[in-house]
């Protein structure tokens, strides 16, 4: 099982993904696009990356906005995998 991050490690890693917000046992970010198709294209790119890592975000799509929530459910909170995926997702936007 993947190891949970200590609070001080979470704070340090948040500095590397400044657009992500800490929410209890997860991090989240909302991305805004010009329209629905662009949002869906982004979700498809995220899905490919998530599959390659076998680490899947919670995704909420609202017309031109996509909210991603990252947490390692099997560990019950944040792990390095969440921050690795956040970094990769930021490059896809």
Predicted stretch roles:
Residues 1-36:
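N-terminal first-folded block
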Residues 35, 46, 63-65, 72-74:
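Short glycine-rich, polar/acidic loop-and-turn segments at beta strand-coil junctions
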Residues 39:
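Flexible nucleotide-interacting loop at or near the entrance of a catalytic core
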Residues 42-46, 83-86:
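Short amphipathic alpha-helices in soluble, non-transmembrane regions
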Residues 52-61, 67-71:
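Mid-chain, well-packed structural core segment of small domains
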Residues 67-92:
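C-terminal structural segments of small proteins and small subunits
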């Amino acid at each position: 099982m993947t190891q949970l991050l200590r609070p001080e490690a979470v704070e340090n890693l948040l500095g590397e993904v400044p657009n992500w917000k800490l929410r209890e046992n997860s991090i989240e970010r909302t991305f805004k696009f010009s329209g629905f198709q662009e949002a869906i294209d982004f979700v498809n790119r995220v899905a490919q990356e998530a599959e390659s890592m076998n680490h899947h975000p919670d995704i909420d799509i609202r017309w031109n906005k996509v909210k991603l929530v990252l947490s390692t459910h099997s560990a019950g909170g944040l792990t390095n995998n969440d921050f690795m995926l956040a970094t990769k997702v930021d490059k896809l936007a």
